[in-house]
Every structure is written in structure tokens, then in C-alpha cells.
């Protein structure tokens, strides 16, 4: 029971680290820095990994992080789909930078498949196959003029 409590606490802390890192990396899009530098998906993932490396094993292996950046025109309904289907992380995921100064709404999502170790004795918080828990962070914003 003690190990389950510790694992749950670490999981919640890791979720907060991912939220903060995603918010800071998404700010690069909100303030035009990503657009001005032509930041591609790999560069965005690298920036995010540099911000969360204290808790996450994604530095040097960007496959552990999945990002989804979608741009919505003003007045358009924002539809976000559940990334988990039948215990697997599924897309479609995209990466599209908003035009600088556009009135569009941008939604940035970051996902990390966190491995779980205490999954027996009736305590199993996995929501992915392979005893993993999907950690997700979302930032939504309008690009600064």
C-alpha cells in the first residue's frame, strides 16, 4: 500500500511538471517566438523536454513525448478528441503553427506514457496497455497581436 501511495504522489507531481512545461513551451507560440524562428515539431519537443527533464525520460528520445498543436479560426467550434482508444494512444495528431498576430485559438496538447510499477493487489491506475498511464497537458490561447 505504501508503494501505491508513493507512486500515485509521484504521478501527480509528474503531471504538474508536464503542465508547467507545456504552458511555458506553448508561450513561445503565443508570443511569436516559435513562428519567427520557424520552430518545427522536433524543435518544440526538444524545448519541452528541456523544461521537463527533471521528471521525464525524453531527452535524446523524443518518441516518448507526443504533441498535438491545432489552430482554430474565430467562431469555429473547438473539438478535441480523446487520445486513448482501446488502451492505445491514437491520433490524429498534428503540428501547425498559427500565423503571427492571427485572431485564431490555438490548442497545444502534450502526452507522455508514464510507466507504472504498482499495478497488482487491486490497485491499477493504468489507462494504456502495458501498465502505463497517459499524462496529458493542455494549453489554449490566442496569439498575441
Predicted feature locations:
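Alpha-helical assembly-interface signal, strongest on the long, hydrophobic N-terminal helix that forms
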Residues: 1-51
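Extracellular/periplasmic head regions of type IV pilus-like filament subunits
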Residues: 37-76
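Extracellular/periplasmic catalytic domains that process cell-envelope and extracellular macromolecules
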Residues: 61, 99-103
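Charged, often glycine-rich, active-site loop that binds/positions anionic groups
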Residues: 73-90
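A short hydrophobic beta-strand element
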Residues: 80-85, 104-114
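Short, P/G- and charge-enriched loop/turn segments at secondary-structure junctions
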Residues: 92-100, 123-128
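Low-complexity, S/T/G/P-rich flexible repeat/linker segments used as non-globular hinges
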Residues: 111-145
Amino acid at each position: 500500500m505504501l508503494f501505491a501511495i508513493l507512486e500515485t504522489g509521484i504521478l501527480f507531481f509528474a503531471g504538474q511538471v508536464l503542465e508547467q512545461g507545456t504552458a511555458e513551451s506553448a508561450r513561445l507560440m503565443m508570443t511569436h517566438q516559435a513562428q519567427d524562428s520557424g520552430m518545427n515539431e522536433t524543435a518544440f519537443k526538444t524545448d519541452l523536454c528541456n523544461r521537463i527533464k527533471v521528471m521525464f525520460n525524453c531527452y535524446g528520445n523524443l518518441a516518448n513525448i507526443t504533441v498535438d498543436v491545432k489552430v482554430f479560426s474565430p467562431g469555429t467550434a473547438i473539438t478535441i478528441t480523446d487520445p486513448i482508444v482501446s488502451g492505445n494512444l491514437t491520433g490524429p495528431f498534428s503540428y501547425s503553427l498559427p500565423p503571427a498576430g492571427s485572431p485564431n485559438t490555438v490548442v497545444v496538447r502534450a502526452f507522455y506514457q508514464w510507466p507504472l510499477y504498482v499495478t497488482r493487489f487491486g490497485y491499477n491506475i493504468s489507462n494504456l496497455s502495458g501498465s502505463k498511464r497517459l499524462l496529458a497537458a493542455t494549453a489554449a490561447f490566442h496569439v498575441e497581436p
